[in-house]
Amino acid sequence: MRPEPTTQPTQPIVSIVDTPARVREAVAAAEDRKAVDLRVLHLEKVSDFTDFFLICSGTSERQVQAIADAVQERMREGQVRPLHVEGFNRGQWVLLDYGDFVVHIFQEEPRRFYSLERLWGDAPDVTNEFRS
C-alpha cells in the first residue's frame, strides 16, 4: 500500500536563508576558535560562483581543523551543510563551500603563498560589517 500524499508544506532545508546572516555566524564561529587575520570579501560583483569569501588563519593544523569544525557545527545548527569540503585531514588549507559563500581556513605559509586577498583584490573587504 502506498503512503498517502501529503498536502502540508515541507520544512525548508536551510533555516538560515539570509547569506549575510550565515556569513556572520561563520565569522562568529571562527572568532570563537581564535582565528587570526580574519577577512570577509564581497565577491558578488566580481565572481559568478559565490558571493562571499571568509578567509582566516590558524597557527597549527589542530587549530585550523578546530576552526573548520566550529564553522561546520554552527552551520549545522542552522541546518546548513557544506556542498563540498577539502583539505580537512591535512589541516594546511581547509575549504568549506556553502555555495553562496566559501570559507578558507589556512595556516600562515599556505595563506601567504596563495594570497587570496591579493588574487581577489577587486572584491571589497567587508570584514567590519560581519564582526560581532
Residue spans for each PLM region:
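Long, contiguous binding/interaction regions
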Residues: M1-V40, E44-K45, T59-A66, E73, ...
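Glycine/charge-rich, flexible interdomain linkers and switch-proximal surface loops
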Residues: R39-F49, L83-D100
